């Protein structure tokens, strides 16, 4: 994982990986603990309010922008292909899943913060937690 500033201990730390919806919904700042997001999510966050929230979280050190490993991206793609949903996922969605996998492989207890039902189901299939932002959710 490129850009990693801290790992997780064997006993685990909690980490929440944010998709674009966490910024658009304005919910990112209310989430507890370590927050992380991949670079492609930054590219998708365009509106002024969401962008301000993202930049505030980055500048205060609450949010880490981390690139997922190639290994984790391959695993996320493979699982999406098996589930028959690869065509429904954006590059940012795949990076969110892959980053969550990387953090889990480091020993973190990881959840993906998203309202995207496809992303929720894949996260659950991969043994990751899910944080719903505005809607009840698929899992």
UniProtKB/Swiss-Prot annotation:
Q: Which SUPFAM superfamilies match?
A: PIN domain-like
Q: Which residues bind Mg(2+)?
A: 19
Q: Which residues form the PINc domain?
A: 14-121
Q: What are the required cofactors? A: Mg(2+)
Per the UniProt record, which EC number(s) apply here? 3.1.-.-
Q: What class of enzyme is it?
A: hydrolase
- What processes does the entry annotate via GO biological process terms? maturation of SSU-rRNA
Q: Which Gene3D superfamilies match?
A: 5'-nuclease
Pfam family for this entry, one? PIN_6
Q: Which GO terms describe its molecular function?
A: magnesium ion binding; RNA endonuclease activity
Which Gene Ontology cellular-component terms appear in the entry?
A: preribosome, small subunit precursor
Entry keyword set: Hydrolase, Magnesium, Metal-binding, Nuclease, Toxin-antitoxin system
Q: Does the keyword Nuclease apply?
A: yes
User: What superkingdom heads the lineage?
Assistant: Archaea
Keyword Coiled coil annotated: no
Q: What is the similarity comment for this entry?
A: Belongs to the PINc/VapC protein family.
HAMAP family for the chain = VapC_Nob1
Question: Tell me, what does this protein do in biology?
Answer: Toxic component of a type II toxin-antitoxin (TA) system. An RNase.
Q: What is the name of this protein?
A: Ribonuclease VapC3
Query: Per the UniProt entry, what species is this protein from, by scientific name?
Result: Aeropyrum pernix (strain ATCC 700893 / DSM 11879 / JCM 9820 / NBRC 100138 / K1)
Q: Which gene encodes it?
A: vapC3
């Amino acid at each position: 994982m490129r850009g990693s500033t801290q790992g997780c201990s064997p006993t685990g730390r909690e980490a929440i990986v944010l998709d674009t919806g966490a910024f658009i919904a304005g919910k990112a700042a209310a989430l507890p603990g370590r927050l992380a997001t991949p670079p492609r999510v930054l590219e998708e966050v365009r509106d002024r309010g969401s962008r301000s929230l993202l930049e505030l979280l980055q500048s205060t050190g609450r949010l880490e922008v981390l690139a997922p490993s190639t290994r984790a991206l391959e695993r996320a793609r493979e699982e999406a292909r098996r589930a028959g949903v690869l065509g429904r996922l954006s590059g940012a969605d795949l990076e969110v899943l892959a980053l969550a996998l990387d953090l889990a492989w480091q020993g973190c207890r990881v959840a993906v913060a998203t309202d995207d039902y496809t992303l929720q189901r894949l996260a659950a299939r991969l043994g990751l937690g899910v944080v719903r932002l505005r809607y009840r959710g698929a899992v």
